[in-house]
């Protein structure tokens, strides 16, 4: 393992990514944060404590981002992918935390790993990310700060995830908002 190389996925030395020496888009997104999918026939319904536990992981991803947004994909109680906002690091306006987590998952698993899974994100998804979430057929979305809260600190497309989901009857999804919202908002500078 090469320890001092700069990682493609985070831009940081020694992130632990086993693909640090490869220079390709797929390698950059296939970070070791992606864990094997453990399929079980009957998963227990997540509790509020579960939601907070996984949101704390998403918040940690956000703290490590150049722009404080993080996401975690969970299937059957196991984290299968993580993502943080890399749009500034990669000069890619589509590299939102949710999109990075989805791409990392798909670099290792087929799309069936996403169907029915839960996506935890520190900010209510924008229209682009929510569209991807719906097309991936996630079963559940849990976010911290709402679009309205985020709009007090940065530009937002003022459409809620629930409104977008209501227009996608092909992709039913459960949406829970406000989980550790104060912690997510604390990552942003105060409003001017």
Task: Identify the role of each PLM range.
Residues 67, 113-115, 137:
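Short loop/turn motifs at secondary-structure junctions
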Residues 89-100:
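A short, polar/charged loop-to-alpha-helix boundary motif
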Residues 70-74:
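Short beta-strand scaffold segments in enzyme catalytic cores
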Residues 111-123:
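Immediate flanking context of iron-sulfur cluster ligation sites
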Residues 2-65, 125, 132-192:
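Zinc-dependent deaminase
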